[in-house]
Amino acid sequence: IKADFHLSDSIANLFPFMVFLWFFLLSIPTSMLMNRIGCRKTVLLSVVITAIALLFPCLDYSLGMMLVSFSLLGIGNTLIQVSLNPLLANIVSGDRLASSLTLGQFMKAIASFLGPIIAGCMLLRFGNWLYLFPCFFIVALVSAIGLSAVSIEEQKQERESSFMQCLSLL
């Protein structure tokens, strides 16, 4: 993005910063949303938002669209990071939960490690790293379809937490 749009270092660094900014702004509201609509629907919403974010650069590779795309990626990441572990707790029994969470973190670390390598391979193979967007869009779409087809019985919350109660945990 930096080279494509001739951005300075400080402007180019806004892209990854936006992902973290959205996590800061939306993590507590996401937990409140999750309490209202459930973990599965929140994870599904995160995958749909991520898929939309990955589709935008395919339609229009412009600086403005990349800003929107990275913002949506940050929002999607926030939703999934807040809601995925509670969803897993509804699926995996208590004695296997810790190892399942650890395995999930390991897989996330591997994916983060492989991302730049895959981008480099796409660049070498096809001459353009932008082919990552449709590939990851397809992965997100398949994930959304798969999750929407599965029924998960979620534990009901006795009461919803207020914004201030969530904030007091920090």
Question: Each PLM stretch: what is its role?
Answer:
Residues 100-152:
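Helix-loop-helix hairpin linking two adjacent transmembrane segments in secondary transporters
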Residues 1-10:
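Short amphipathic helix-loop junctions that connect adjacent transmembrane helices
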Residues 154-170:
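Juxtamembrane intracellular "pre-TM" segments in multi-pass secondary transporters
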Residues 20-28, 113:
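Residue-level signature of mid-helix packing/kink "hotspots" within the transmembrane helices
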Residues 53-57, 73, 147:
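MFS-fold secondary transporters
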Residues 13-20:
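Short hydrophobic/aromatic, small-residue-rich stretches within specific transmembrane helices
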Residues 69-106:
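Cytoplasmic helix-loop-helix junction between adjacent transmembrane helices
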Residues 25-64:
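Conserved MFS/SLC helix-loop-helix module at the cytosolic interface between two early adjacent transmembrane helices
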